[in-house]
Swiss-Prot record:
Keywords for this protein: Activator, Disulfide bond, Mitochondrion, Nucleus, Transcription
Record gene name: Chchd2
Residue numbers covered by motif Cx9C motif 1: 116-126
Any Pfam family hit: CHCH
Organism (species): Mus musculus
Intrachain disulfide bonds: 116-146, 126-136
GO MF assignments: DNA-binding transcription factor binding; sequence-specific DNA binding
Name of the molecule in the record: Coiled-coil-helix-coiled-coil-helix domain-containing protein 2
Length: 153
Protein backbone atom coordinates (compact mmCIF):
# COMPACT_ATOMS: atom_id res chain seq x y z
CA UNK A 1 0.00 0.00 0.00
CA UNK A 2 2.71 2.40 0.43
CA UNK A 3 2.89 2.41 -3.27
CA UNK A 4 -0.71 3.29 -3.63
CA UNK A 5 -0.49 6.10 -1.17
CA UNK A 6 2.56 7.39 -2.89
CA UNK A 7 0.93 7.44 -6.21
CA UNK A 8 -2.03 9.26 -4.80
CA UNK A 9 0.13 11.82 -3.10
CA UNK A 10 2.21 12.22 -6.20
CA UNK A 11 -0.93 12.81 -8.21
CA UNK A 12 -2.21 15.29 -5.72
CA UNK A 13 1.07 17.18 -5.45
CA UNK A 14 1.54 17.96 -9.13
CA UNK A 15 -1.56 20.16 -9.24
CA UNK A 16 -0.33 21.86 -6.09
CA UNK A 17 3.15 22.28 -7.59
CA UNK A 18 1.67 23.68 -10.81
CA UNK A 19 -0.23 26.35 -8.98
CA UNK A 20 2.93 27.89 -7.46
CA UNK A 21 4.60 27.74 -10.86
CA UNK A 22 1.75 29.68 -12.37
CA UNK A 23 1.99 32.19 -9.59
CA UNK A 24 5.74 32.38 -10.02
CA UNK A 25 5.44 32.93 -13.74
CA UNK A 26 3.69 36.31 -13.38
CA UNK A 27 6.43 37.34 -10.98
CA UNK A 28 9.06 36.55 -13.59
CA UNK A 29 7.18 38.37 -16.35
CA UNK A 30 7.42 41.80 -14.68
CA UNK A 31 11.13 41.20 -14.23
CA UNK A 32 11.43 40.60 -17.96
CA UNK A 33 9.40 43.69 -18.86
CA UNK A 34 11.69 46.40 -17.38
CA UNK A 35 14.53 45.58 -19.80
CA UNK A 36 12.01 45.86 -22.62
CA UNK A 37 10.95 49.23 -21.22
CA UNK A 38 14.61 50.25 -21.00
CA UNK A 39 15.13 49.52 -24.68
CA UNK A 40 12.77 52.31 -25.89
CA UNK A 41 14.54 54.79 -23.64
CA UNK A 42 17.85 53.81 -25.24
CA UNK A 43 16.27 54.34 -28.65
CA UNK A 44 14.80 57.64 -27.49
CA UNK A 45 18.16 59.13 -26.49
CA UNK A 46 19.47 59.61 -30.06
CA UNK A 47 16.26 61.49 -30.88
CA UNK A 48 17.17 63.98 -28.14
CA UNK A 49 20.35 64.90 -30.05
CA UNK A 50 20.04 67.98 -32.32
CA UNK A 51 18.94 67.08 -35.81
CA UNK A 52 21.06 67.94 -38.81
CA UNK A 53 19.43 70.00 -41.55
CA UNK A 54 17.89 68.03 -44.37
CA UNK A 55 19.05 67.92 -47.94
CA UNK A 56 16.63 70.65 -49.06
CA UNK A 57 17.76 72.97 -46.25
CA UNK A 58 21.39 72.47 -47.22
CA UNK A 59 20.57 73.15 -50.87
CA UNK A 60 18.67 76.32 -49.95
CA UNK A 61 21.58 77.55 -47.83
CA UNK A 62 24.03 76.89 -50.63
CA UNK A 63 21.80 78.66 -53.15
CA UNK A 64 21.52 81.68 -50.85
CA UNK A 65 25.31 81.81 -50.52
CA UNK A 66 25.72 81.62 -54.28
CA UNK A 67 23.17 84.39 -54.79
CA UNK A 68 24.89 86.70 -52.31
CA UNK A 69 28.30 85.96 -53.80
CA UNK A 70 26.99 86.60 -57.28
CA UNK A 71 25.41 89.91 -56.23
CA UNK A 72 28.62 91.06 -54.56
CA UNK A 73 30.70 89.99 -57.56
CA UNK A 74 28.47 91.76 -60.06
CA UNK A 75 28.34 94.93 -57.97
CA UNK A 76 32.10 95.03 -57.59
CA UNK A 77 32.60 94.18 -61.25
CA UNK A 78 30.33 97.00 -62.38
CA UNK A 79 31.96 99.42 -59.97
CA UNK A 80 35.45 98.60 -61.20
CA UNK A 81 34.77 98.35 -64.92
CA UNK A 82 32.34 101.26 -64.99
CA UNK A 83 34.63 103.51 -62.95
CA UNK A 84 37.81 102.79 -64.90
CA UNK A 85 36.51 102.38 -68.42
CA UNK A 86 34.45 105.52 -68.57
CA UNK A 87 31.06 103.84 -68.48
CA UNK A 88 30.82 103.22 -72.22
CA UNK A 89 30.30 106.78 -73.43
CA UNK A 90 30.02 107.16 -77.21
CA UNK A 91 32.77 109.77 -77.46
CA UNK A 92 36.26 108.76 -76.23
CA UNK A 93 37.86 111.08 -73.73
CA UNK A 94 40.35 113.53 -75.24
CA UNK A 95 43.79 113.36 -73.67
CA UNK A 96 44.94 116.50 -71.87
CA UNK A 97 48.15 117.60 -73.57
CA UNK A 98 48.82 120.59 -71.32
CA UNK A 99 51.20 120.14 -68.44
CA UNK A 100 49.72 120.70 -64.99
CA UNK A 101 51.49 120.84 -61.65
CA UNK A 102 50.20 118.19 -59.23
CA UNK A 103 48.17 119.83 -56.47
CA UNK A 104 48.73 117.08 -53.94
CA UNK A 105 48.80 113.33 -53.64
CA UNK A 106 44.99 113.10 -53.53
CA UNK A 107 44.54 114.90 -56.82
CA UNK A 108 47.37 112.95 -58.41
CA UNK A 109 45.78 109.63 -57.36
CA UNK A 110 42.44 110.71 -58.80
CA UNK A 111 44.01 111.68 -62.11
CA UNK A 112 45.95 108.44 -62.43
CA UNK A 113 42.99 106.17 -61.61
CA UNK A 114 39.99 108.19 -62.78
CA UNK A 115 37.79 110.86 -61.30
CA UNK A 116 35.87 108.50 -58.95
CA UNK A 117 38.74 106.34 -57.73
CA UNK A 118 38.36 107.50 -54.11
CA UNK A 119 34.67 106.59 -54.12
CA UNK A 120 35.44 103.23 -55.72
CA UNK A 121 38.12 102.57 -53.12
CA UNK A 122 35.74 103.43 -50.25
CA UNK A 123 32.99 101.24 -51.67
CA UNK A 124 35.35 98.30 -52.17
CA UNK A 125 36.73 98.63 -48.63
CA UNK A 126 33.18 98.66 -47.26
CA UNK A 127 32.19 95.63 -49.33
CA UNK A 128 35.24 93.69 -48.14
CA UNK A 129 34.78 94.59 -44.46
CA UNK A 130 30.99 94.11 -44.21
CA UNK A 131 29.24 90.78 -44.35
CA UNK A 132 26.15 92.40 -45.92
CA UNK A 133 26.67 94.55 -49.03
CA UNK A 134 23.43 96.39 -48.26
CA UNK A 135 25.32 98.19 -45.50
CA UNK A 136 27.45 99.80 -48.24
CA UNK A 137 24.53 101.40 -50.09
CA UNK A 138 25.69 104.88 -49.00
CA UNK A 139 29.08 104.38 -50.62
CA UNK A 140 27.41 102.96 -53.72
CA UNK A 141 25.15 106.02 -53.96
CA UNK A 142 28.13 108.40 -53.62
CA UNK A 143 29.94 106.45 -56.34
CA UNK A 144 26.89 106.64 -58.59
CA UNK A 145 26.61 110.41 -58.06
CA UNK A 146 30.32 110.83 -58.84
CA UNK A 147 29.96 108.87 -62.05
CA UNK A 148 26.94 110.97 -63.08
CA UNK A 149 28.73 114.22 -62.22
CA UNK A 150 31.75 113.23 -64.31
CA UNK A 151 29.70 111.97 -67.24
CA UNK A 152 30.72 108.37 -66.73
CA UNK A 153 27.19 106.92 -66.74
Amino acid sequence: MPRGSRSRTSRVTPPASRAPQMRAAPRRAPAAQPPAAAAPSAVGSPAAAPRQPGLMAQMATTAAGVAVGSAVGHTLGHAITGGFSGGGSAEPAKPDITYQEPQGAQLQNQQSFGPCSLEIKQFLECAQNQSDVKLCEGFNEVLRQCRIANGLM
